């Protein structure tokens, strides 16, 4: 079972790179299906180089017995797994269309059925609230990342002010699906704001559409996996 998780993490990384969601500094993790007090995350490498042999195992304090280099931002993952037992996968990216919503006052809200999983709006973690305006804006310490997890609350995504995006979900595939459509939703909202008054999803539409779209996760995964094969990347 763990081997399957490793393979999904590698495939997910390739999909996110191929679809333009992840850049050089993104990373995705999965909770250990055999030990919920642990999670898997690749060693500190450029994402395009990651293989199943690069996966490290961490406890919920972000510690590992693996002596290879680890991402400093592993605490984003550990603190979310610690506070959200329902979460099985965590992704951190600098998703291009979403990134502007990390530094403007306009909230990121769903405007189409594909973005219903967002909820009524995406929370933003503001590091200045506790740490002032001379930080590196980085999620590299347990205390900062505990605050990120707190800002996430029970939602599916949180933005890090002037930095990036954190997606969570109940599976690797679900998180990839959500990351792709969060990017699409942000691009659609930005375009809509340039045209006229935006009509956002209602609470009822968010609830109902979210259930319908959530059932299509494997379809998305299969499509993006095929695109990898067509590109010679799988």
Swiss-Prot record:
It catalyses: 5-hydroxy-6-methylpyridine-3,4-dicarboxylate + H(+) = 3-hydroxy-2-methylpyridine-5-carboxylate + CO2. The active site is at residue 73. InterPro entries: Aldolase_class_II_sugar_metab (IPR050197), Aldolase_II/adducin_N (IPR001303), Aldolase_II/adducin_N_sf (IPR036409). Its EC number is 4.1.1.51. GO terms for molecular function: 3-hydroxy-2-methylpyridine-4,5-dicarboxylate 4-decarboxylase activity; aldehyde-lyase activity; manganese ion binding. Binds 1 manganese ion per subunit. One of its GO terms (biological process) is vitamin B6 catabolic process. Its cofactor is Mn(2+). Mn(2+) binds at residues 73, 92, 94, 163. Belongs to the aldolase class II family. Involved in the catabolism of pyridoxal 5-phosphate (Vitamin B6). Catalyzes the decarboxylation of 3-hydroxy-2-methylpyridine-4,5-dicarboxylate to yield 3-hydroxy-2-methylpyridine-5-carboxylate. The decarboxylation proceeds by an aldolase-like mechanism in which the binding of the substrate frees Glu-73 residue from its interaction with manganese ion replacing it by an interaction with the hydroxyl group from the substrate. Glu-73 residue then provides the proton for the keto-enol tautomerization. This is 3-hydroxy-2-methylpyridine-4,5-dicarboxylate 4-decarboxylase. It comes from Mesorhizobium japonicum (strain LMG 29417 / CECT 9101 / MAFF 303099).
